Amino acid sequence: MERILILMQAANWAEATEALTSARENALHRNALSYALVLPEAPTSPEECNMAAFGALRYLVSPEMTFAAMETLWHGERYALLAHPAMRFERDWEKKLLRALNDCPVENAQAVLTGYLPAQDDPIGAVCPVAAERIDPDGTLCFAHGMPLTLAAHPMPGAFLHPDFFFARAGFIRAMAQGSGTAFLRAMVQGWQCCTLNQPVITLTHDLPVPPARIAPQEDGLAQLKEEYGVDFAAGTLSAAGKRGF
């Protein structure tokens, strides 16, 4: 089994415990998992003891989760999962994520699973693409849940990356740590393809919205975004595909 790094930002160890425990207890191959936390301040001595007892866990003190922070925490794992304290995992989740990555209708090595994971009380219970809702006059792109993938046979390619969830080869982190700018545009320019996960193998205790993104008019990738998804920043218009998320 290939090694998987689970990356998570949390206020403290207590906030992360339930999600990490859910990931570990429901994994088919627990020994293939390693864990990395980004914390706003150093843990207390009792917290460090609990973290050490949990298993292969390391941490970094940083005010925010950035790709540079992720790269620092990476220790050679082949795959990386950006996780959130609100996540809860179903049985054999890592096997299912790997299968979904292989099922992406793009080159496996360049695919990135993402999307709005469903909340546990969601009546539909499907993953939704990250879709464009509108472009404000100041160049701010606002996001919304796209069309739920209730019957999709495989992950669906799309333009946008959820900032709290992705699963990909670890090379994605290393590539994204270089450079700056809007994450989904940087991924697009570098040849990575975001794909909405088609099976809800992870659910959430509450919905995680995608914050608006202020896009600079000179950012790389805007022409490609317009051509492939009909999101036109110059005109401030969105295509049907942009509003669906795929």
Model segments located where?
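Catalytic cores of eukaryotic secretory-pathway lumenal/extracellular enzymes that build
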Residues: 2-246
